Amino acid sequence: MSNSRKMSEPPRFFVGPEDAEINPGNYRRFFHHAEEEEEEEDESPPERQIVVGICSMAKKSKSKPMKEILERISLFKYITVVVFEEEIILNEPVENWPLCDCLISFHSKGFPLDKAVAYAKLRNPFVINDLNMQYLIQDRRDVYSILQAEGILLPRYAILNRDPNNPKECNLIEGEDHVEVNGEVFQKPFVEKPVSAEDHNVYIYYPTSAGGGSQRLFRKIGSRSSVYSPESNVRKTGSYIYEEFMPTDGTDVKVYTVGPDYAHAEARKSPALDGKVERDSEGKEVRYPVILNAREKLIAWKVCLAFKQTVCGFDLLRANGQSYVCDVNGFSFVKNSMKYYDDCAKILGNIVMRELAPQFHIPWSIPLEAEDIPIVPTTSGTMMELRCVIAVIRHGDRTPKQKMKMEVRHQKFFDLFEKCDGYKSGKLKLKKPKQLQEVLDIARQLLMELGQNNDSEIEENKSKLEQLKTVLEMYGHFSGINRKVQLTYLPHGCPKTSSEEEDNRREEPSLLLVLKWGGELTPAGRVQAEELGRAFRCMYPGGQGDYAGFPGCGLLRLHSTYRHDLKIYASDEGRVQMTAAAFAKGLLALEGELTPILVQMVKSANMNGLLDSDSDSLSSCQQRVKARLHEILQKDRDFTAEDYEKLTPSGSISVIKSMHLIKNPVKTCDKVYSLIQSLTSQIRYRMEDPKSADIQLYHSETLELMLRRWSKLEKDFKTKNGRYDISKIPDIYDCIKYDVQHNGSLKLENTMELYRLSKALADIVIPQEYGITKAEKLEIAKGYCTPLVRKIRSDLQRTQDDDTVNKLHPVYSRGVLSPERHVRTRLYFTSESHVHSLLSILRYGALCDDSKDEQWKRAMDYLNVVNELNYMTQIVIMLYEDPNKDLSSEERFHVELHFSPGAKGCEEDKNLPSGYGYRPASRENEGRRSLKTDDDEPHTSKRDEVDRAVMLFKPLVSEPIHIHRKSPLPRSRKITANEVVSENANYLRTPRNLVEQKQNPTVGFELYSMVPSICPLETLHNALFLKQVDDFLASIASPSTEVLRKVPEMSSMATRSSPGMRRKISLNTYTPTKILPTPPAALKSSKASSKAAAGGPSQAMAPHTSSRKKSINSKTEGHEPKKSTGKKR
């Protein structure tokens, strides 16, 4: 078949028969001529055989796939297969090679391609895979050039060619978070590939905001395909292709063509995710066949013809709603698929016969295949199938958030401000390691000058400079965005404050330096998130482990077989991003560092204010609420009936309970203040005690930093006029909760009393700041949550799978009982404000009428008692489908609501509210039906029962089922080939009980023993109709609901935006950038540094930073959200 003729034909795809395995007794009929029986009856002399020669290295020609396929090709009546021996290929001249009519030859390491080309020229056989094109496939530059010429989508790339004799002379500029190659800028994360396709050492570089470092990919060695490295600088020798990193949610698709009309696709876990190769019980890498969409079939057709390779493998990346080709591998076969072996042999045999039969006068007609009939599983009885899981989750345990302000006038600060383009907007946010290192160097230099000369003209406050230095030196490394410095230009200095005399006030320009630190996820928070991820698996079909040997294997199987459409979104705060990554690690049983998981699995969701609140300031409604709240809590008398009415018109039992405990708010604040004074004096005493000199507190904090933290609260809580600043109550509660939980080994006195009182005050202040009356709660909640509500509505509506999702191919799937099933999971990780707001919407937005709905009334009674939405609070929405109901019936789709108030508090919280347990109406354990199957394997039905999403519908199940219960130990059993269980079965163990080991609070790596356990999920409602929920969400999201009816997935929205916005990463991690000593030369700089000559912007501006860099800087800042007491906690 000539190439010109091929190109004119439209792509036409076929697959083989439905029988996924054909035993040798049966498959002769597929390969022999249709009229074989009649032919055999004639006694005419036998026709000449067509000889197919296999010319490749022995490792390839003797591999299992090749043997399987050749065995099948040999069954064609007129075809004989001859395999060239490696000895002959390497050592004999081509004239001595065996003769053949058709040549299948391909390059691999050590193969003499030149000789194969010479042989083809000498003997002129029909060549299956063009040999000259195989030279080009060995160079990625040529591959990319051909792909581009064919109009096939590629990641944005640039080529860096280096002269090996002079590697330094090349067009590469490397920055901290980007490289510039031939004028093309690539922000991290980006990919660096050697130009030689035979070199598999591909590196992916991560941005400093995600922890920096790189993932080093290589040819599989045992169970590893990549390893994480702290090295952040690109390679300095060799030629490379640099390309934009594509966020594929941790999945690669490998496509295998056999001729232009046939392509088999398999998905596997991306080697860049955690570098762990998933293998089955036979030690083979786990891959699952997936369905290509029409665009991808066209790509396969183009690749096959452009490279003139009948048998050809290439890699697809599915990202941003598009499919990109990132590698063409040439001749390669699928491993371990009987169906593919049959199809491949049949197609190759037909190609050979079609081309050569006429020359050999062999009668041949191509057998026609019936179209594949799609497999449509049917169900009987009232069965429900899980279709969608949506969860909104608060971040995990974090360090207390802290802030220090100081006015600076030294020229060095102005120089830094100008260097970083601060004059453009009058504000500057510094959080990159290099920037923080510069601020630290300035602080060290000024302190050294102050130490050497007390009469120095340096105006900066010495104690504040020392605090700046101490905080920046904390942990010995800069890590993501756990610290940041903001500088604001003040043309006339700081405005006068009440304690400042007018005549002392300076009119000269100054900079307001605000140092923020803390608020980062603790090691305990990471454990919490990972454990919750593990527990979360148990909500999916097969989750209880009854048939599986370990809990949650239902989800792992669903996910690994690419029937799970998972997207994880997080707001742009480091603690939230890291919580999301740790949760994903537990949910999907991943291993290794969080940075690669973060970059590939977690999407930033601050577009449209989805999880971040847009406004910097409080809304007018919040201002009114805050003022009223502060007024009530400033009265020095016991709460009156009128106060109860004013503070809790909604009748919240948790708030009433706290008011009973407090009685007189001012007297309680007095007690809290005196307890803080007692605490600071105890810490001072410890600091003076030589035995406590080197004491290390939790997460590298020192006694000095702990004292500063509490001293600042002591100073800020009670104002100069003797009144209390109520907005500091959440901070006090935050700090004491942290110390009781993590620094209990100090055994400070009265900490539990301070915890109890500050919690009672916080239990009033925090929830009531989101509104006192129901109308206010709803108004404030809408301000925070409307974009999120719209997105949730769109998630529930999109019950039809789109073609960009990885779908399992039903015909090729062995041992997967329900290949058509697809479950969508959307996880939204955010801060406290969104969780409070979403819960307010559910409670007060009129979803159900509690006077008519008994189940909703019970749920509202339970929520009334919940006093805190702690770390890892979850609101979970689950959508089920009943395939037996008519598509237009309201009963077709069914929604459930579940809720957990998150982590349990400290020891004394014995009276946690308890609901009615986790009672999904569609419990698979209830009334489970036995499956009748025709499968020959007797154990299959039991094994695959795990894999069913069909569950019996029962409105109420009385027994509470906690997803955090301790699971039984896995029972011993043979794991079948298709189950995805890594040989390091680290998640086969019983989940770690999230801790109540209080006996020895300091034991364990990073104090694992202090990770608080998480309250189990409670069912709020398990019998809602989708229409009812949709109408409710539409009413909340109005007036612009209709515009967002077709909200696309965030990934596709990102595609349409500029390339710079395609992947916005603003993350945090524990991969350190080491803090450097200040260079001696800088310390010797003259003391004549002038005080403050910078009256305005200088003419010499720093180079213009790229818009991408600017967007990262501006968006990732934790802008003092809401200047309020409880926001973004």
From Swiss-Prot:
Substrate binds at residues 59-60, 219-220, 254, 268, 332-335. PROSITE patterns: HIS_ACID_PHOSPHAT_1. This is Inositol hexakisphosphate and diphosphoinositol-pentakisphosphate kinase 2. GO terms for biological process: inositol metabolic process; sensory perception of sound. The keyword Cytoplasm applies. It comes from Mus musculus. The modification Phosphoserine is found at residues 44, 229, 1051, 1058, 1066, 1106-1107. It comes from the Eukaryota. Keywords: ATP-binding, Cytoplasm, Hearing, Kinase, Nucleotide-binding, Phosphoprotein, Transferase. Ubiquitously expressed. Expressed in the cochlear and vestibular sensory hair cells, supporting cells and spiral ganglion neurons.
